[in-house]
């Protein structure tokens, strides 16, 4: 998204926030909401990336603690012509990943242990290239600020249930209607904005990510595995913080309750089809990738150590536990 669209999006979310303030507290409530919204936008610009990483207990890694993963991201960043982002691991079984940061110079990428353990090196490269594409397209600032404001709007909607509106703003039916609007319409509108942001940027990041890693089929295979994993492996932190769902490469919500009624992401099959079409146009055949993707994934992370003694470097047959061990 360019800066104009980003500014329009933030302005729209701010108007939603102010509208809830008006419904709950009249003119005074609207002004208080405006002040809070401006403060949140400024705070979000500088700190929303740190908040999201802390929310998911992300652990920063480097070339010593996660050499293969770190070097993979470094190589992909060089391919994209980007500064080296900070690299994080999230100790979460569900395979997934996201990027955050206000600009390419202050960016971070994060992958779950589930993703690193279950995907092949090529698939991990496709996923991280997709996240770097978000950084290059400057989607990350929008993603993090939207997550912050959407969460706040939903929170105010919940407050409306307890506060029940303001007498000055309307008695009787109008007070009830205002409260219902704050409770239902505003959080729903915030979700629609998240959907609009996510659906357009995901296709663009898929395309650019495929260019960065050099093979669209790496990413298409990864998307299929991640989508299947997200359906059966719940991400409890994401379930508790659904406003951040649009940041992930695949919707992390399991569909419990109404969380998944409207997806924040495009249909995975459509994304895979677009990548496969891109591969065909590049003259890349799918047979090699299919063979790789069909291989057992028990030791399939980019640092996976074979169980045999190939190369004579086996450490007594001990199982490698990953770059975070």
From Swiss-Prot:
The chain crosses the membrane at residues 20-40, 145-165, 173-193. Its EC number is 3.4.24.-. Binds 1 zinc ion per subunit. It comes from the Bacteria. Residues 306-325 have a biased composition (Low complexity). It is found in: Cell inner membrane. It comes from Brucella canis (strain ATCC 23365 / NCTC 10854 / RM-666). InterPro entries: HtpX_protease (IPR050083), Pept_M48_protease_HtpX (IPR022919), Peptidase_M48 (IPR001915). It is an enzyme of class 3 (hydrolase). This is Protease HtpX homolog. PROSITE patterns: ZINC_PROTEASE. Belongs to the peptidase M48B family. The gene is htpX. GO terms for cellular component: plasma membrane.
